[in-house]
Amino acid sequence: MLFASNAIILKIKQRNSNSYIYTLYTYEEGLKEVIIFTNQKILCSNLKLYRIYFVLFKKGAPWDQIQRLYPLFFYPKIEQNPLKMIVLEYLSELIIYQLYSPENCTFIYFIFHYTLFQLNICSNNMILPIFISSLYSLLKFLGWEPELSNCVYTGESLNSENSNLTDSKIGFSASYGGIVKLNVLPKQEYIGFFNKDELFIFTNDN
């Protein structure tokens, strides 16, 4: 299968002057932490796989104990966009610290891969809907769903005729776990905004 040996970078941490620890999400094994040596490009160049494949080693293993070659996805347009990078980092942290079980790793992998693909080609005004859709799917996997019908701060309902939520933009707060009326939280708590029609389309798609 095409995805069977793919890996997605979730996090990179410098180990020493010669190597980095890469936290990856793989199709077959879920989370995988490996050491990548900076001079591995010599080996990869010889294999004509430079910039396409990463050579994975067990921690502390010598050079002759290569585990596997993983095709690794690159998303240059995400790396060039600070807002897209925030989304990538947020979802990565969620996967690393909450979705660590190897069970159903293919399900999580497909959600994350699809999200990265969409972020790489989308315009700025589509970043939030893509993020919310992916977050919604991942949180459902954990058994919790964001609140998308009522303001989690005031309790106002989108379906109420008397609510001004129906006539204005609706904020979304990841830390509060759902939609929030504008101007009731500090500005930094809002990661984006919907109007009612956009939110209706999103909730019906999921």
From Swiss-Prot:
One of its GO terms (biological process) is DNA recombination. It is found in: Plastid, Cyanelle. Its main location: plastid. GO terms for cellular component: cyanelle. The keyword Transcription does not apply. Coiled coil: none annotated. The keyword Plastid applies. Gene3D superfamilies: Recombination protein O, C-terminal domain. Keywords: Cyanelle, Plastid. SUPFAM superfamilies: ArfGap/RecO-like zinc finger. This is Uncharacterized 24.3 kDa protein in hemA-psbN intergenic region. It comes from Cyanophora paradoxa.
